[in-house]
């Protein structure tokens, strides 16, 4: 009995130590970044939506023709909400690309969240990446914060995570993004550093690859896709909700999995006149393929900050979809 009591006390102490390893950042940084606390050794964020998040780097070049297989495997294996953020820079002679995968974990304590993260990483390595030969690696906190600044400002600068804990530090993340109307925004108060945010609203069932725009038009693109697969119980709840909403008792969901998706596209140019001319071509391109794309009117700053922060500041607008549509929206 004494031995069991001793083991229980040791376990309780270990749980407390794990939970205490979460370091809360300054209140000013919390407001700017949407992050409440970090676990530096595990590279995990605790965010203002009360979710734990971990970010991974994905090498787009290795994906090649495996996009659909990856998305389908993630939807079949996990029920976490997952966000892919792809940044594409078309400079005319080449297209540069980098990509992140942000995974949401719901848990009451960090001890519970860490177990979920470990289970996720074991599964994705054994059941997905080792089979598809895709390289997905955890992103360190320093690198992640540097990429957040790059996505927002267009300038790469090394970020010292120690700045997050100082109340005297001033972070300007998000301050310089101004709504210019009709989904457009201006960065740093400069009309020559501007962009537009677009929101996906509808997709044809047999939608083709929607990536030729990125190859033809010189610009910087942020492609942001959230998706989540639901289990059998959640699927039935979703079906009943649809029936209630549309007063249709015959709604059936034939897919093995119910998958919801949110799609955002941001296009950034260095010239306001060029952006204006390109805007029509963007909507014409999607309209031609029967994809309903709308400017992010009224939520421009909120959406762009969510995109550039890799989902640390959360914004999404989900609708039913399938893995093929998701995979056809990024390169």
What are these regions (language model features)?
Residues 1-330:
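Extended, folded cores of ATP/NTP-driven motor/assembly subunits in large transport
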């Amino acid at each position: 009995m004494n031995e069991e009591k001793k083991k229980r006390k040791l376990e309780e102490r270990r749980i407390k130590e794990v939970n205490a390893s979460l370091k809360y950042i300054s209140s000013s940084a919390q407001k700017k970044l949407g992050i409440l606390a970090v676990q530096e050794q595990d590279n995990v964020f605790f965010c203002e939506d009360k979710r734990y998040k971990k970010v991974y780097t994905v090498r787009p070049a290795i994906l090649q023709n495996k996009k659909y297989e990856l998305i389908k495997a993630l939807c079949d294996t996990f029920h976490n909400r997952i966000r892919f953020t792809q940044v594409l820079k078309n400079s005319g002679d080449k297209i540069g690309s980098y990509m992140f995968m942000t995974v949401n974990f719901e848990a009451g304590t960090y001890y519970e969240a860490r177990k979920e993260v470990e289970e996720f990483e074991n599964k994705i390595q054994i059941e997905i990446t080792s089979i598809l030969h895709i390289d997905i690696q955890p992103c360190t906190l320093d690198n992640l914060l540097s990429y957040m600044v790059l996505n927002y400002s267009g300038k790469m600068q090394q970020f010292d995570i120690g700045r997050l804990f100082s109340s005297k530090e001033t972070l300007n993340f998000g301050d310089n993004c101004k709504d210019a109307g009709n989904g457009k925004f201006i960065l740093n108060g400069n009309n020559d550093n501007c962009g537009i945010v677009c929101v996906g609203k509808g997709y044809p069932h047999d939608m083709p690859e929607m990536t030729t725009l990125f190859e033809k038009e010189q610009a910087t693109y942020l492609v942001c896709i959230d998706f989540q697969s639901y289990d059998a119980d959640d699927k039935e709840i979703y079906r009943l909700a649809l029936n209630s909403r549309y007063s249709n008792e015959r709604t059936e969901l034939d897919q093995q999995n119910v998958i919801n998706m949110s799609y955002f596209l941001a296009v950034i140019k260095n010239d306001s006149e060029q952006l204006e001319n390109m805007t029509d071509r963007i909507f014409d391109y999607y309209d031609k393929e029967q994809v309903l794309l709308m400017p992010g009117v009224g939520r421009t700053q909120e959406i762009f900050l969510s995109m550039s922060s890799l989902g640390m500041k959360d914004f999404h607008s989900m609708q039913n979809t399938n893995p093929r549509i998701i995979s056809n929206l990024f390169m």
